[in-house]
């Protein structure tokens, strides 16, 4: 059965949440751009932590060209389950296309942060934004008391990039330098973890007439 395009479009996840949770365990599993993309993806999760998006939907939210995301689906599988499914389309030459259902991992209490959707409005390159999320994940009381060399080694990044990104964050008012390191100043961007809601678990329900079907008298 072919489905009109307008119905297919309505199947994508279009409702944005006010926040996204990010587990600290993924800090070294994604590079900065992909970590920010993961944040954007998570903002559009449903109650079961599922997101039905195409690459073009993600590119639209991150402000990138689709070509920049050519390896995203492969890379993101380091932190979540991506299920592929066939979708019929109303096209004269093509009967179906393949879609992705991203399954956001559940909250790993207490080792996670809660980041406001307002972060998407911060005017910084996505590499810098992803780097900032990494800092939030490893900071203690919003402070990082490491030298540039040690921080670069910890994050698996180059020292020059760390230095450059820190300066960008300082100019954006998201970081201030202190003796022996720096302090993050996310203000309203970093939310209290108490507001975070764990994902719901989907439990298949038998049809209403299941009992009648099972115990139908002979």
Predicted regions and their residues:
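Electropositive, intrinsically flexible nucleic-acid-contacting patches
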Residues: 1-218
């Amino acid at each position: 059965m072919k489905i009109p395009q307008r119905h297919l479009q309505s199947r994508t996840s279009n409702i944005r949440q006010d926040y996204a949770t990010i587990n600290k365990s993924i800090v070294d599993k994604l590079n900065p751009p992909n970590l920010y993309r993961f944040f954007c993806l998570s903002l559009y999760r449903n109650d079961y932590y599922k997101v039905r998006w195409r690459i073009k939907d993600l590119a639209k939210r991150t402000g990138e060209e689709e070509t920049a995301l050519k390896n995203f689906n492969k890379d993101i599988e380091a932190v979540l389950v991506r299920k592929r499914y066939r979708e019929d389309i109303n096209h004269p030459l093509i009967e179906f296309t393949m879609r992705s259902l991203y399954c956001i991992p559940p909250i790993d209490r207490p080792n996670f942060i809660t980041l406001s959707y307002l972060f998407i409005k911060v005017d910084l390159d996505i590499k810098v934004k992803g780097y900032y999320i990494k800092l939030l994940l490893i900071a203690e009381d919003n402070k990082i008391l490491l030298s540039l060399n040690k921080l670069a080694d910890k994050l698996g990044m180059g020292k020059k990039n760390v230095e450059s990104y820190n300066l960008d964050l300082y100019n954006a008012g998201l970081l201030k330098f202190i003796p022996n390191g720096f302090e993050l100043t996310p203000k309203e961007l970093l939310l209290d973890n108490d507001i975070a809601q764990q994902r719901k678990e989907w439990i298949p329900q038998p049809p209403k007439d299941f009992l009648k079907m099972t115990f139908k008298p002979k």
